[in-house]
Amino acid sequence: MGSIASPSLSSSSQLLTITVEFTGGLESIFNNTRKHTLSIPATYPSPSTGEPEPTSVASLVHYLIENVMEDTRQELFVVDGAVRPGILVLINDADWELEGEEKYQIQQGDNILFVSTLHGG
């Protein structure tokens, strides 16, 4: 696997260890691996200002595309930079709509589950 750029970490940066899972066929675009234990930066550059801000689900999605997904078919996971409609997201077994959706700030030990509810026929 080649080197992939990620947000630079300073010596004072902290990492969050989280579990990310993919089901419903999504695992096929994430190296055919259902469960990933990741250490991600606790802060991520803001898309608007470039300043560090606490890592959110939106930042995690970008991180996953840049650092975990090897498949080139990003459109199966995201549309216009957001999680594709038809993909259920659970944060610690709760619907992400209850947690603030893409604005939810990732916490140490979180379990984020992406479930595709779309199936070909």
Swiss-Prot record:
Cellular component aspect of the GO annotation: cytosol
GO biological process, one term: tRNA thio-modification
Assigned keywords, A-Z: Cytoplasm, Isopeptide bond, tRNA processing, Ubl conjugation pathway
Pfam families: Urm1
Localization terms from the record: Cytoplasm
InterPro entries named among the record's database cross-references: Beta-grasp_dom_sf (IPR012675), Mopterin_synth/thiamin_S_b (IPR016155), Urm1 (IPR015221)
SUPFAM superfamilies referenced in this protein's UniProt entry, alphabetically: MoaD/ThiS (SSF54285)
Predominant place of localization: cytoplasm
Keyword Cytoplasm: yes
Metabolic or biological pathway: tRNA modification; 5-methoxycarbonylmethyl-2-thiouridine-tRNA biosynthesis
Transmembrane segments: none
Per UniProt, location of the Glycyl lysine isopeptide (Gly-Lys) (interchain with K-? in acceptor proteins) cross-link in this chain: 121
Family: Belongs to the URM1 family.
HAMAP family to which the protein is assigned, alphabetical: Urm1 (MF_03048)
PANTHER family from the UniProt entry: RURM1 PROTEIN
Protein name: Ubiquitin-related modifier 1
Organism: Ajellomyces capsulatus (strain NAm1 / WU24)
